Amino acid sequence: MKFQMKMKSELCRTYKYWLILLVLWLSGVTQRETGVLIVDADCIPPNGCKALAYYRLKQGDDLEKLQGRFQTNNSEVLAYNPQLVDANSIQAGTNIYLPFDCLCLNGELVHRFSYTVTTNDTAEKVVDVTYQKLTTVGAVRSASNSGDLSSIYSGQSLTIPVRCYCGDPNVDPKYGLFSTYVVQADDQLTSLSTNFSVDADVISKFNSDTRNLSPDSIIFIPSKAANGSFPPFSGYVLGTVHWRSNVGIIVGVVVGGIVLAVLLLFALIFGFKHFRRRKLAKEPTMQQSGLLSSSSMAGSKPSRSGSTMLPVPKSVEFTYEELAAATDNFSLAKKIGQGGFASVYYGVIRDQKLAIKKMTLQCTKEFLAELQVLTNVHHTNLVQLIGYCTTNSLFLVYEYIENGTLDHHLRRRKSDDKPPLSWLQRVQICLDSARGLEYIHEHTKPTYIHRDIKSANILLDDNFRAKVADFGLAKLAEEGTGTGIVGTFGYMPPEYALYGEVSPKLDVYAFGVVLFEIISGRVAISSALPSENDQQSPAQNRESRTLTSFFEPVLNDPDGKTLLPKCIDPALNGEYSLDAVWKMAQLARRCTHQSPDMRPTMRFAVVQLMTLASVTQEWDVGYFSRASSQSQPPSGNDQL
């Protein structure tokens, strides 16, 4: 009877949960026009589109500078501007289209560009000159969460919102690409029609009032793609039923009823399975379903501690006595690492070197997460889990990685007798780490998000090949809003730090920060020192600065490549290919884009780094061949 009452209670909770979801889903279905049943969304289409900004080149502008300002690339710009035969010889006064992603943010179609203030900038200059009134000072103030922009300073980061438009199939489905255009003083509807090769009435029906065009106002003009034709509206597909009668409503109700029935059935099945899982998890026995694949550990015996953990395949359950003996009772001399909730010890069992992580009993969630991932995921660029123990504390036992963490090597002391990481080693470490992340993002079943990528969680073996470690915060790769913010500041993307939005692009952002670390040798967040001309004391003016903001001025500068060496780790002693470092910095910049939709996938990063590794190997051979041919013997750093 007690079991039946628990089962009934569990099913009731599950039923209510799914019923609430169904009601919310049905309430989102509205009839915007007679006979058109659509999912409620403030943007058309909800997933955004590609858009263009109409821009007149001014003196001193060039494509490289504009690409940084509008966060696009050379190939995209040339694709939408076939009149530009030579990108290096464009003149002031030339009108061009700058492509960007038009995104639905807070119910508005917009793109928020990131701009780093330079010397002599004012808010008005940034808006009126740099972005040619595609936005307003008020919009920048609101988007940047700044109360006052009357005194902006060099290095300050501003968010530049530029409105955009994707079209509307209910107005005219033949047009799906639009330019954001700032009305000039002498503009007339007829002149715009001529300049953009589009009928005046077409411009009028997509804009509210074109009879009295107001200077500096924004209008959206249908534009042609690279093939010379107007692309049709193609993004408005989510939840549409293009029937011109009330049949759409009937269909919606019928479908809703079917969905309700299916959801109730799934709720019953889910409730039963969920209850059974919880019941099994509380049983005080452990079934050992597999031993180590490593023959050197085959003699380890399963623990008889009566632990309450779930069965774990392909892992050994060590006894507490084994781990204590291997670490001299967890002595300080055997301690090789310390985190917020765990200590790591070195030990040897059956002649195999091991790293033993000791966690408090309060870390059950992190313990289970790492156990779940690493017992099911195996890759050469992911640290290997050997086994575990749940007596007295929670223990995870890993393969021992000889050269420790990446951050230790990047921030090595001058007294350290180990040489700094060479540029070739750094590129290989980036590629190895990217491959490990790509594997958990795309090739495992289920796929995972790490959520705590940082240089301290990348380990280097005796050949300085990288392995991603510490999966205590990993979760299934289901996009949505997380229940709590976890991870490390400096590596968190804005959508996660502010709103808790979780996706694989969270790891991509953190990986981009790691790339910046590898280039510069700096920490992800540091205290910025005041300039020499600052009248305040260093203590008064010291503030935290992220590594992304450290690189922004250089990457946004038209002479950024020339300025880049000041950002490069001095430990490299000039022994690197500037072209290769610049390409890695550009990849890091893409990975740390403010918008997750604009960040690449880890697969893209792997491909880029494979090319970079190949080029770097060729450079490395040539560089040291030239060095060895010189009459003077090479310095210590040349021998890396």
Curated annotation (Swiss-Prot):
Disulfide bridge map: 43-104, 49-166, 102-164
User: What reaction is this protein's catalytic activity?
Assistant: L-seryl-[protein] + ATP = O-phospho-L-seryl-[protein] + ADP + H(+); L-threonyl-[protein] + ATP = O-phospho-L-threonyl-[protein] + ADP + H(+)
Please list where the region (Disordered) is annotated: 286-308
Keyword annotations: ATP-binding, Cell membrane, Chitin-binding, Disulfide bond, Kinase, Membrane, Nucleotide-binding, Plant defense, Serine/threonine-protein kinase, Signal, Transferase, Transmembrane, Transmembrane helix
An example molecular function term from Gene Ontology annotations: protein serine kinase activity
Name of protein: Chitin elicitor receptor kinase 1
Membrane-spanning segments:
249-269
Q: Name one GO cellular component term.
A: plasma membrane
Q: Which family does it belong to?
A: Belongs to the protein kinase superfamily. Ser/Thr protein kinase family.
Its annotated compartments are: Cell membrane
Which PANTHER family does the entry mention?
CHITIN ELICITOR RECEPTOR KINASE 1 (PTHR46204:SF2), CHITIN ELICITOR RECEPTOR KINASE 1-RELATED (PTHR46204)
Gene name tied to this protein: CERK1
Q: Decide whether keyword Transferase is in the record.
A: yes
